[in-house]
């Protein structure tokens, strides 16, 4: 009887207890950024910051060589095609599985539409304002569409950061909308803002479509399809709508190459981030593109930056800080072993 008492039995040497982890390792395992936080950081550093260079560089290429948006779109799509080599090496179908091929093509079409509208808008309105309208519309539409289609809500802090970022965008673009010039110049400016809005709407809808795609090699497949659809839609228009225009000097070629590389990096990071975090929060964090575009608009393009632009940019940065700080929550992994 006494031998069966748990406190009198000696420890079984054949089943040693697992060694306890050091305190630093336990802290690292118990407290690390969640998937949503990782997604937002990827969207901020890999999506918003590189994308902020795309608008000013596109405008510089247009100023130097009168390079239309159609040629810019074609050049960007060309950077997507080498991804086919990666898919071939992995043995994956280039166009994706047959059962989801329609949605993958639809996402590629929406992505090309968003890019084309963005490149067209930046040629008639300041780069910062075009990015502002596009990101603002994508954020609002993402919040509404996700709430209606996926019933995925947001916390109070998320809503605070989301509405604050939209307020910052209104502060930036509002004065310019109220002072549109009359005549043909005002019409072109209004058309540019309209294109930026449509581009943001297409972006938000495309992100929701991408979240519904679940298959191996999803990201490289849709990246290749975006380039393929963009070329198939743009190359015929190159000979129908206008005579082909090529960059005329080395700086123009450099701008075009930088646009293609930075846009591909931003596309990859945003597509990854939207699978980890709420689409509206991803779009809100992407408002960092607006701040970068305004800085480059002033220092590279030597365009005027109004005081309202500076105030709005500060509000946007503060809102991004709120969203990021709230989502920097710690996620416990594993349970305490007895």
Curated annotation (Swiss-Prot):
Coarse class of the protein's main subcellular location:
membrane
Q: Which residues cross the membrane?
A: 40-60, 67-87, 105-125, 160-180, 190-210, 221-241, 255-275, 281-301, 310-330
Alphabetized, the UniProt keywords read: Membrane, Repeat, Transmembrane, Transmembrane helix
Where is the segment annotated Disordered? 1-25
GO cellular component labels: membrane
Report the membrane topology from the UniProt record.
Answer: Multi-pass membrane protein
Superkingdom of origin:
Eukaryota
What range does the record give for the signal peptide? none
Q: In which tissues is it expressed?
A: Expressed in placenta and testis.
SUPFAM superfamilies per the UniProt record, alphabetical? Multidrug resistance efflux transporter EmrE
Query: Which intervals hold domain EamA?
Result: 49-174, 272-325
Q: Where in the cell is it found?
A: Membrane
Q: Which Pfam families does UniProt cross-reference here?
A: EamA
Which protein family is it in? Belongs to the SLC35G solute transporter family.
Q: What else is known?
A: This gene appears to be the source locus of an SVA-mediated retrotransposition event that gave rise to SLC35G3, SLC35G4 and SLC35G5 genes.
Q: What is the protein's given name?
A: Solute carrier family 35 member G6
């Amino acid at each position: 009887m006494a031998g069966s008492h748990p406190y009198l039995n000696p420890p079984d040497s054949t089943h040693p207890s697992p060694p306890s982890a050091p305190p630093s390792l336990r802290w690292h395992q118990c407290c690390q950024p969640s998937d949503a936080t990782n997604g937002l950081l990827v969207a901020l550093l890999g999506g918003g910051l590189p994308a902020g260079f795309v608008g000013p560089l596109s405008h510089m290429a247009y100023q130097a060589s009168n390079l239309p948006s159609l040629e810019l779109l074609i050049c960007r799509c060309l950077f997507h095609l080498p991804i086919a080599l990666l898919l071939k090496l992995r043995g994956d179908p280039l166009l994706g599985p047959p059962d989801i091929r329609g949605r993958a093509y639809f996402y590629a079409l929406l992505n090309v539409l968003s890019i084309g509208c963005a490149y067209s808008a930046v040629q008639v309105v300041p780069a910062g304002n075009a990015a502002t309208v596009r990101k603002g519309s994508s954020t609002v539409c993402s919040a509404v569409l996700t709430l209606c289609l996926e019933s995925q809500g947001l916390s109070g802090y998320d809503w605070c950061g989301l509405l604050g970022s939209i307020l910052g965008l209104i502060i930036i673009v509002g004065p310019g909308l109220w002072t549109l010039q009359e005549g043909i110049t005002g019409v072109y400016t209004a058309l540019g803002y309209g294109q930026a809005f449509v581009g943001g709407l297409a972006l938000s809808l495309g992100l929701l479509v991408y979240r519904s795609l679940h298959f191996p090699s999803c990201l490289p497949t849709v990246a290749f399809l975006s380039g393929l659809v963009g070329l198939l839609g743009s190359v015929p228009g190159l000979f129908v709508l206008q005579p082909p225009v090529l960059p005329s000097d080395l700086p123009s070629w450099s701008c075009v190459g930088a646009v293609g590389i930075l846009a591909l990096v931003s596309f990859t990071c945003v597509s990854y981030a939207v699978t980890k975090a709420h689409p509206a929060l991803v779009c809100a964090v992407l408002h960092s593109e607006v701040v970068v575009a305004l800085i480059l608009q002033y220092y590279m393009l030597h365009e005027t930056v109004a005081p309202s632009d500076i105030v709005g940019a500060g509000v946007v940065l503060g809102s991004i800080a709120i969203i990021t700080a709230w989502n920097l929550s710690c996620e416990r992994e594993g349970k305490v072993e007895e």
